[in-house]
């Protein structure tokens, strides 16, 4: 693998959906890089720290939210003079989202009183009251024509289906949940999967018109669903429960029939299990010193005993499945079981059996499959990156500033699978699965020198707003000015 040097940032970074650009926030500025050559394309500067930024789905615009001031600003990558500012300082902003057409923006007000939908084309605004959440349970159909929204009224849960053309209400129905926690929409847009609170062991399936298709309650007592994920082919629903099991359900059947329970409460692995176990171990010098921080993987012999977290032993093996990651081809599922927090379980869906266990020295913080091939990246809050392929496992040392040791805790892939970000709270590295000539390491000092070419701009005034369909006109006017 090939890596950049360490880059300091303020905790916010993202590839554009088309993988062409990389945006990195540095407190009061957002810097746009060409993802292939890592050269600065644009730099947007502000007086307030950026709370959140989002790429538009078409990768042409970027939205910045400033929660403290209640202002949202949108900039164009191709035309830096195009600016849209939305001022919600009176009601406040706690989150923001794009619509699939990249021409409307959702803003969520304080206390989830309402959400506002702002059009970048005609400046119109639509308001929807009582969204239950500001950061989840807002879904769009595969074609982007409809939106499903979880709502809460008079202590009861509802789902509203809206047409995204004008956000008119298409259907509205109550769901039989105690406290709706999560919402999934199948890729064929025919089924809405409703997850109840972890205090209940239940999930339900509805049609977008409000008809109940299925209801499942695997057991009666104890905590319920911790994590829910659809497979990439949308054929299988995977639910991580607090009893240490991963349950798979068939989305192709009308009743969402349960396929299997995959139990993580495993004490001993034997030859009969046909499971490969890789364990990370420290490398000792000939003197026996282990303080060099170098580690390696060893393939374990059988029988092999898994060490359960001591704090959870008294709970009789109870623990949540807190991470579920499907491979691109939906042939493998990687999971984390909180009672065995140092272990990665990899399940093979063709056999419905455990394929591999990776035992780390430190608890798993994050893991992500490549969007293009079966490569799994794993981080454990240290200066190493762990990779799993169908053939082997590898440990990669991450080089960083000696004064600021790297503690990798976050992962993010570009959609084309050619690059990824591994980061902690203050610094990040850009990695490439294969070493290509055009993806050579770069020097952050060179980037800083390029940034100085960009003029520091004052905060944007609200009246500097141009509808989306006027971008070309602005470009033409700018060209005319240059000719003069």
What residue ranges belong to the model's regions?
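Long, low-complexity intrinsically disordered regions enriched in Ser/Thr/Pro/Gly
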Residues: 1-484
